[in-house]
């Protein structure tokens, strides 16, 4: 049976934390930024934690993690 492969898209988007949670970056911060307020852009900086309902789905895409 062949090896299970990690989805490249998931590998680039998600990071696993030591406590089992999954970290992701916010979207909407690449272009068309002039119409967004400074507050909107500031709140999109940094990372967010994926909801517990989606963690199982992300783990299925990354079997080696």
Curated annotation (Swiss-Prot):
Pfam families: Ribosomal_L35p (PF01632). One of its GO terms (biological process) is translation. GO terms for cellular component: cytosolic large ribosomal subunit. One of its GO terms (molecular function) is structural constituent of ribosome. InterPro entries: Ribosomal_bL35, Ribosomal_bL35-like, Ribosomal_bL35_CS, Ribosomal_bL35_sf. Keywords: Ribonucleoprotein, Ribosomal protein. It comes from the Bacteria. Belongs to the bacterial ribosomal protein bL35 family. This is Large ribosomal subunit protein bL35. The lineage of its organism: Bacteria, Pseudomonadati, Pseudomonadota, Betaproteobacteria, Nitrosomonadales.
């Amino acid at each position: 049976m062949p090896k299970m492969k990690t989805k490249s898209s998931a590998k680039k988007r998600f990071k696993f934390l030591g406590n089992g949670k999954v970290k992701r970056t916010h979207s909407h911060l690449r272009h068309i930024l002039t119409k967004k307020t400074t507050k909107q852009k500031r709140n999109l900086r940094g990372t967010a934690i994926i909801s517990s309902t989606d963690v199982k789905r992300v783990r299925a895409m990354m079997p080696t993690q």
